[in-house]
């Protein structure tokens, strides 16, 4: 098991070094309260150039309000990271958003994602939150990962997050 590191603000740019490449061939669509898989194809070869421009200020704002950015390194290479925001989310404002969550392509399937997810869940509980709010890309394998961690569809999505990412699958994972 790789020991997690808490990133400092000046290290947030390292998040973009994670190899997010993957082939996506099935997506989920939420209809009538149920997930419906459908075929679609994306060959993701890394970060879209607009991602850094769009999300870096969001990451920095999260950090500045006390958010935690956990990272796993193999030597000098960042191989996985997760960010837990402190801003209240959800219908009762008692959830904390899993703001960023990626495992490098060559490290998937080794338990690193599960390790980081559990770390964020424990951190949310320590901060007094009822659980995690996850706004997931609709990629079937990603959503299935979250479901396997104990997430479930949230009945009432966070208004701001749903407006920002209406195609995402909005989930909640309660602290145990």
Walk through the language-model features, giving the residues of each:
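Acetyl-CoA-dependent GNAT
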Residues: 9-10, 17-94, 99, 104, ...
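Short polar/acidic secondary-structure junctions
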Residues: 88-90, 137, 159
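Conserved acetyl-CoA-binding loop-helix of GNAT-fold acetyltransferases
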Residues: 100-103, 109-122, 147-148
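Short glycine/proline-centered loop/turn elements that form peptide/ligand docking sites
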Residues: 113, 117, 139-142, 159-165
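Conserved GNAT acetyl-CoA-binding A-motif
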Residues: 124-137
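Conserved catalytic-core motifs of GNAT/GCN5-like acyltransferases
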Residues: 133, 147, 152-169
